Amino acid sequence: MYFSNANFVSSSTIPAAVLPLPSRNYACFRMSHRKIHRSLLSSSVLEFMAGRNLRVLSNSSNRESSDTSTDFDVPFPRDYFDLLDQAKKATEAALRDNKQLMEIEFPTAGLESVPGDGEGGIEMTESMQLIRQFCDCFIDPLKATRTRVFFPEANEVKFARNTAFEGASFKLDYLTKPSFFEDFGFVEKVKMADRVKPEDELFLVAYPYFNVNEMLVVEELYKEAVANTARKLIIFNGELDRIRSGYYPPFFYPKLAALTKTLFPKMETVYYIHNFKGQKGGVLFRCYPGPWKVLRKVRNKFVCVHQQQDMPSLKEVALNILPSS
């Protein structure tokens, strides 16, 4: 199995928290269908990320590790250390139940943040940092070379190799590559048959949500390299709610909309956090194998106001469950 006994306070996680700015050659990034450079991120942003990660590490050093398996009464995480530990145990439980296609989704701009609270480029950078920490604690070092981490595009792989994944043994790969029209938001899909190797056992796909082609390639990866094999696939912060909610009109994006009937029914959401703001705000939370819970914060504590076995739609939570609780 992939389970690792690594602790979050291991030395391998510390360098990733205090990284220097990358050179412009490795800083190409996608936002609003044009390239901007990660090197334009201010040093204060990286200091913020480093400070947050180091606070997580210091908090973890004061806690005793627990061998208790994930149960039905998992509390909302206190910080990102708790979150990653819960996600690790949830994924382990799903693997024991022979789940093959899994989703992990949570906000990166703060545990109680909502999409849009953070700048897109910064949120992706933080996802990359958290994915590395998840890999370090979840994947056995002996399995690292059999684990392939897919980023949205080749430039992201270059950035990862020089920052969060520097020195890592994981195989880093990409879903799309630039095309002649990349400045207009067009990319070429990568043939998964050309990327996957026979020794690969686990695929982890990082935030495949900016370009619509990215999730279509993920579907291809599942069909060609995971289905009917012993391999596993984890989609990490893919913002799949955009597809579930109809954000992409089926008339214009029929292949993407079809994923809700073809790929998503095969997928187990093993760890999930989605926040709702406002007077009737709350949280939709799930930690496998537990039920889906709707939580509300009361006097700085999260209280469960509703739970069910199947995932409710975000619209149902926002318009029905939270207002009536």
Where are the language model's segments positioned?
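Short beta-alpha junction loops
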Residues: P152-E156, F236-I243
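Short acidic/glycine-rich loop or secondary-structure boundary segments that cap or lie
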Residues: V212-E214, R242-S245
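Charged interaction segments
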Residues: Y222-A225, N237, G246-Y247, F252
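N-terminal chloroplast transit peptides
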Residues: M1-E64
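A conserved mid-domain beta-alpha-beta active-site/ligand-binding segment of alpha/beta enzyme cores
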Residues: I243-L322
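Positively charged, amphipathic N-terminal segments that serve as targeting/anchoring signals
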Residues: E47-T229
